Curated annotation (Swiss-Prot):
Enzyme Commission number(s): 2.7.7.66
Cross-referenced InterPro entries: Holo-ACP_synthase, MdcG_C, MdcG_N
Active site: 148, 150
Similarity field: Belongs to the MdcG family.
Keywords: Nucleotidyltransferase, Transferase
Molecular function terms, GO-annotated: nucleotidyltransferase activity
Source organism per UniProt: Bradyrhizobium diazoefficiens (strain JCM 10833 / BCRC 13528 / IAM 13628 / NBRC 14792 / USDA 110)
Leader sequence segment: none
Catalytic reaction equation(s): apo-[malonate decarboxylase ACP] + 2'-(5''-triphospho-alpha-D-ribosyl)-3'-dephospho-CoA = holo-[malonate decarboxylase ACP] + diphosphate
HAMAP family xrefs: Malonate_MdcG (MF_00650)
Name of the molecule in the record: Phosphoribosyl-dephospho-CoA transferase
Amino acid sequence: MTSPCKHGDRPPGRHDLVFVSPAGWRAMLDARDDLAADSLLARWPKMRWPTIRRRALPHEATGVALGLPLPPSAGKKRVALLVEIDHVASVARPPSLQQARAYAPRNWWPTLDRLDGLALRHSVDARVYGSLAWQSLTGLDYVTGRSDLDVLFEFRSETDIDRFVADVAAIETSAPMRLDGELMSADGAAVNWREVHGGASELLVKSIERVVLLDRHQFISGATGS
């Protein structure tokens, strides 16, 4: 479903899927006594399911910070992991809308199709994260009747951001779920699409390294201040 690349091709970034080697999994789980008895987590290396890149905590000075959200049946527990870079087998982007479509509730399909068409018209690469992404990656039940659709909109320099978010808002009016998600620039910095649509002059910009407030026009022009 995803298209992994070797970790040396580029460092794992925000929302990236990170596939860990068997040795890496052993090292991670051996370091965590609290995870030893988790039978669901033990399936991850056996099934070769990915983890997701997350922002490192202040005390995590070395290694690659990873996350793993368990499904509602396991209490939606979020597992924080840390692995040495040499144990990163490959990295992939999140699933595309079309890749995830078959795993979504049928009443979500028209919304996914409309968003996919919208992304194509606006030169945007649209991908899913959150519950639908994990359901498509693992086959486990993550999506519930209260789930949002989380979409990552990776825009380009030619994208008309204001028009695009207005069109996303229009699609949401007839969607059976809440549309959540982020607009991501080429350097990996991202903002919530609703903040942009709401006309905020300053935006909360998230990257893999930090969270900062940035002038709206700076973010849209690609000047993230990094």
